[in-house]
């Protein structure tokens, strides 16, 4: 098989040699250095493809059956263009043709998808030493969060850090957060006036940062969140891009430089707040204090750099989920005015006719609003793909996935498979009144992941979104503009609504 791969390489060299020579003459004008650089790039690309092909062939154990492979005639890029244009359609078509497990190549990497609850169980039940997260996510998150936290550390250390953060995301804190978020929301929407048309995704993204910073970072850091710092967060958030995923971090791209500068400046803000809190010795019951008091199993306390990195990670990891989900839910409610009015009336039924300030216990009883969030997360999960790198051979559905494959689950596809969901494309919050809306399948609904990989910020996200939308429903009625319901923007890593402008009108008292 390796010999066959070698013959393939020779064929490519022979076929490409004359074409390359002609192209080089035209592009470089005969400049020797330019011609050498292009020739080297061409040769290295072919060697890379040879190693990829040979590796794909020899890494399977004897007698093992590899997943169905979707061939592409396009070298290196593979299916990147088709997938990037319409990833959900691509995966659903592949599922219909090849079944729940299949592989394909994009940008020189082989991806194996596990669609449907049974196949997805492999990823969600896996151990990190078999299907590894750091190998996939570190290059994306480390420049944003910083060294020494999250996917930059061995998994046991990361698990300890997650446990520290989770201890601060508790009901006692959530009860404090509700009034904070309600106050921030009312203040933010004062500038909207009586009626108008606004980019609701942009507005909610700003509001999510304000509320999350206040709740998760403490009053010292929130007090410094002005327009300049908000732009730093935006630049840092810009580090979550396709370019950052695919290209080396040392490249001098403008977005990389903005990301790195923002990281340094935000860290400095955090360092000052951390030092001020340490020196004051004032014990404030918030997550910043939780981290300052926390220790690893060996008794070592967190450094200021670790605390700052974990606070950045906590904010930005949840910011996408909450802002995207909040915006999409606004459009679903604007499209169904009857449902929107039911959500408003639920506020009066649960909280009181005069709509007093919200409490955590009231939030828990807003069941219809809760189901609307759940259904929004089903049809528009912010994270379309969850990935791991196979470090050991993995067997699923009779196939063996070799080491080196990026193993993927798509919540977007799993949560709308016709094999699992009745009226799968309809926005129907009442489906969750049933005990088993997805035929009892364990991994059919996974917007926050599952098992040991489940997101620790899920409960905070629900508190945040329910409080914001409770306040918004009390303030305004929302409508689509000329019936326009946004399409999905697949060019970003978080799948946001295209042209997310909504019409609003203040409710009469």
Swiss-Prot record:
Quote the catalytic activity from the record. Answer: a 14alpha-methyl steroid + 3 reduced [NADPH--hemoprotein reductase] + 3 O2 = a Delta(14) steroid + formate + 3 oxidized [NADPH--hemoprotein reductase] + 4 H2O + 4 H(+); lanosterol + 3 reduced [NADPH--hemoprotein reductase] + 3 O2 = 4,4-dimethyl-5alpha-cholesta-8,14,24-trien-3beta-ol + formate + 3 oxidized [NADPH--hemoprotein reductase] + 4 H2O + 4 H(+); 24,25-dihydrolanosterol + 3 reduced [NADPH--hemoprotein reductase] + 3 O2 = 4,4-dimethyl-8,14-cholestadien-3beta-ol + formate + 3 oxidized [NADPH--hemoprotein reductase] + 4 H2O + 4 H(+); a 14alpha-methyl steroid + reduced [NADPH--hemoprotein reductase] + O2 = a 14alpha-hydroxymethyl steroid + oxidized [NADPH--hemoprotein reductase] + H2O + H(+)
**Function summary:** Sterol 14alpha-demethylase that plays a critical role in the cholesterol biosynthesis pathway, being cholesterol the major sterol component in mammalian membranes as well as a precursor for bile acid and steroid hormone synthesis.
Q: What class of enzyme is it?
A: oxidoreductase
Alphabetical list of PROSITE patterns matching this protein? CYTOCHROME_P450
Biological pathway: Steroid biosynthesis; zymosterol biosynthesis; zymosterol from lanosterol: step 1/6
Q: What is its main location?
A: endoplasmic reticulum
Gene3D superfamilies, sorted? Cytochrome P450
Q: Which Pfam families match?
A: p450
- Annotated protein name in UniProt: Lanosterol 14-alpha demethylase
- GO MF annotation terms: heme binding; iron ion binding; sterol 14-demethylase activity
Q: Which InterPro entries match?
A: CYP450_sterol_14alpha_dmase, Cyt_P450, Cyt_P450_CS, Cyt_P450_E_grp-IV, Cyt_P450_sf
Look up and give the organism this protein is from. Answer: Macaca fascicularis
Identify the cofactor(s): heme
Modifications the protein undergoes after translation, according to the UniProt entry:
Ubiquitinated by MARCHF6, leading to proteasomal degradation.
Q: Which UniProt keywords apply?
A: Cholesterol biosynthesis, Cholesterol metabolism, Endoplasmic reticulum, Heme, Iron, Lipid biosynthesis, Lipid metabolism, Membrane, Metal-binding, Microsome, Monooxygenase, Oxidoreductase, Steroid biosynthesis, Steroid metabolism, Sterol biosynthesis, Sterol metabolism, Transmembrane, Transmembrane helix, Ubl conjugation
Q: Which GO terms describe its cellular component?
A: endoplasmic reticulum membrane
> At the top level of its lineage, which domain of life is listed?
Eukaryota
Q: Which GO terms describe its biological process?
A: cholesterol biosynthetic process; steroid biosynthetic process
Notes on how activity is controlled: Inhibited by azalanstat. Inhibited by azole antifungal agents ketoconazole, itraconazole and fluconazole.
């Amino acid at each position: 098989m390796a010999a066959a791969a070698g013959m393939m390489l020779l064929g490519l060299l022979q076929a490409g040699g004359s074409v390359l020579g002609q192209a080089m003459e035209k592009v470089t004008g005969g400049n020797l250095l330019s011609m050498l650089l292009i020739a080297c790039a061409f040769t290295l690309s072919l060697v890379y493809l040879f190693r990829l092909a040979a590796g794909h062939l020899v890494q399977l154990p004897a007698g093992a059956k590899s997943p169905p492979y979707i061939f592409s005639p396009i070298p290196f890029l593979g299916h990147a263009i088709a997938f990037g244009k319409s990833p959900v359609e691509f995966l659903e078509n592949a599922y219909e043709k090849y079944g729940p497990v299949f592989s394909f190549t994009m940008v020189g990497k082989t991806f194996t998808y596990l669609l449907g609850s049974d196949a997805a169980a492999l990823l969600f039940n896996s151990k990190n030493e078999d299907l590894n997260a750091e190998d996939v996510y570190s290059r994306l998150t480390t420049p944003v969060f910083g060294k020494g936290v999250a996917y930059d550390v061995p998994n046991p250390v990361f698990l300890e850090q997650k446990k520290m953060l989770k201890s601060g995301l508790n009901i006692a804190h959530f009860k404090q957060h509700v009034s904070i978020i309600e106050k921030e929301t009312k203040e933010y929407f004062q500038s909207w006036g009586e009626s108008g048309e606004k980019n609701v995704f942009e507005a909610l993204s700003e509001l999510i940062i304000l509320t999350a910073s206040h709740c998760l970072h403490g009053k010292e850091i929130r007090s410094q969140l002005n327009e300049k710092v908000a732009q730093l967060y935006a630049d840092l958030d810009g580090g979550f891009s396709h370019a950052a995923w695919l290209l080396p971090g040392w490249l001098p791209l403008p977005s990389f430089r903005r990301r790195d500068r923002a990281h340094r400046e935000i860290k400095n803000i955090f360092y000052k707040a951390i030092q001020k809190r340490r020196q004051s010795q004032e014990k404030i019951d918030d997550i910043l204090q939780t981290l300052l008091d926390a220790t690893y199993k060996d008794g070592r306390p967190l450094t200021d750099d670790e605390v700052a990195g974990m606070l950045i990670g906590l904010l930005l990891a949840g910011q996408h989920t909450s802002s995207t989900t909040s915006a999409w839910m606004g459009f679903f409610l604007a499209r169904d005015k009857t449902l929107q009015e039911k959500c408003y009336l639920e506020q009066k039924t649960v909280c009181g006719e005069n709509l007093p300030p919200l409490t955590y216990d009231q939030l828990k009883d807003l069941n219809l609003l809760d189901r609307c969030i759940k259904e929004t997360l089903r049809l528009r999960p912010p994270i379309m793909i969850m990935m791991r790198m196979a470090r050991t051979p993995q067997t699923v559905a009779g196939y063996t996935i070799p080491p080196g494959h990026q193993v993927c689950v798509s919540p977007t596809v799993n949560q709308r498979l016709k094999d699992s969901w009745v009226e799968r494309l309809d926005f129907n919050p009442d489906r969750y009144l049933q005990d088993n809306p997805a035929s009892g399948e364990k991994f059919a609904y996974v917007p926050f992941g599952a098992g040991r990989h489940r997101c620790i910020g899920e409960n905070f996200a629900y508190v945040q979104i329910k409080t914001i939308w409770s306040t918004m429903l009390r303030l305004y009625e929302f409508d689509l503009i000329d019936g326009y319901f946004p399409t999905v923007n697949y060019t970003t890593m978080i799948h946001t609504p295209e042209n997310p402008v909504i019409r609003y009108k203040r409710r009469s008292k």
